[in-house]
Regions:
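Short aromatic-glycine-(Arg/Gly/Cys) micro-motifs in beta-strand/loop hairpins
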Residues: 1-16
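A short, exposed loop/beta-hairpin motif centered on an aromatic-Gly-Thr core
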Residues: 15-24
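Residues in and immediately flanking transmembrane alpha helices
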Residues: 20, 37-38, 71
Length: 77
């Protein structure tokens, strides 16, 4: 088990996750990251999420992987 953090950013803003989550492995971290991106993109707001990225880091601050929000949004119609 390891503590991972899910920071999100775009070209203008960075939001740091100070709480994080404990996960068993990278697959669980990926699933959690996917749920977070879905949560943010599904909320009713005026935010354009297309240039946002979720950065997943371990407790040492090393980036494990990134999830561009566009992966979850799909192609615009």
């Amino acid at each position: 088990m390891t503590q991972v953090y899910f920071h999100r950013s775009n070209t203008k803003k960075v939001f740091l996750d100070h709480q994080g989550a404990v996960v068993n492995d990278l697959a669980e971290a990926r699933d959690h990251a996917t749920r977070l991106v879905q949560f943010f993109t599904n909320e009713h707001s005026l935010v354009d999420w297309r240039d946002w990225v979720l950065h997943v880091s371990d407790d040492q601050g090393d980036e494990l992987f990134v999830v561009p929000f566009t992966f979850m949004l799909g192609k615009p119609h």
